[in-house]
Amino acid sequence: MQANIFPFYPQPRTSFKFDTKIIEIIIICIVTACTFIIILPGIRGKSRSIWLFRILTSLFIGAVILAVNFTSDWETGIVTATTVYKSFSHSMLNASIGLWIGLKGVNITLIGNPVYQLNETINYNEEFAWESANQFDKNYKDGLERGLPYPILYVAEKFTINSPCGLFQQYCISTYYSSEIMWVAFGSWILYNVLFSMPVILYGICMMFVTAICMLVSLISFASVRQAPVCNIHFGNAVLKTHFGVSYWLSLVTGLFCLIVSLVLLFLYKTQPKVIRLIFSYGEEEDLSDKSENEEEHSSALSLNEML
């Protein structure tokens, strides 16, 4: 009888669905995009569609840079295995064990096949943050005290500071620099949008190029961890292997897109300045400014003649 008694959570817990920070970023971007679309009819001429493309493209780049800092699917892996459910128990269950690695920590999932087994609903998602070594070990000890399932604790143990695998040192360092460089990319994204709204297009193009380079360097920093010896996570004959996730590939595509756009704009700036003026809606404004300057010069000349 004692073998079937397991520790439970003090109250029912809801499994992870969506990260609220990601939802907030998506809502902010959608509201901002809708705002610009509403004021779109007030823009005259051929520059309307170009202006809309600029706004949506810039919002997409900024949203990706900001969102991937909080996602947990930079590197993912899932394995299906039959394993022990709880420590010091002989009860076995068939489940899918998932490992989701992000810049802020890891998420370890356990989903039963089927979900309802051993008189329980087997659907767990536990987050272990690595803001510091003490924080990760504290989360691991809390998991031990709460009686988390054995597969979750087994995977989390591989990332503890004292584990011989050394995964914590590898991932903590690489994700730290990846996150910091990605925040630099976000700052340069804000800066190039400000510069594009001013008559200093070349500086805006340069900052857009810097944004792309920062994103790519951040990806290289994260990918460097895979060059280290891999500590395999075994569940019987099954092995939990990881691969780059959606956030990594999305960041790569966005970084390359930003790089290509900046190089194209730089080429047009050097060879086709009229096209650049059209893209950034500077042509009409410069004509008006030239016209106003001529009118002021003409009026000042007339007043000078009257005085003479």
From Swiss-Prot:
GO terms for biological process?
protein transport
Q: Enumerate the glycosylated residues.
A: N94, N107, N119
Q: Which Pfam families match?
A: DuoxA
Extracellular side of membrane: 1-21, 71-172, 221-247
| A GO cellular component annotation in the UniProt record | endoplasmic reticulum membrane
Question: Which sequence ranges are marked TM in the entry?
Answer: 22-42, 50-70, 173-195, 200-220, 248-268
Positions in coiled-coil regions = none
Return the similarity comment: Belongs to the DUOXA family.
Q: What does this protein do?
A: Possible role in maturation and transport from the endoplasmic reticulum to the plasma membrane of functional dual oxidase.
Against PANTHER family, the record matches this protein to:
DUAL OXIDASE 2, DUAL OXIDASE MATURATION FACTOR 1
In its UniProt entry, what is this protein called?
A: Dual oxidase maturation factor 1
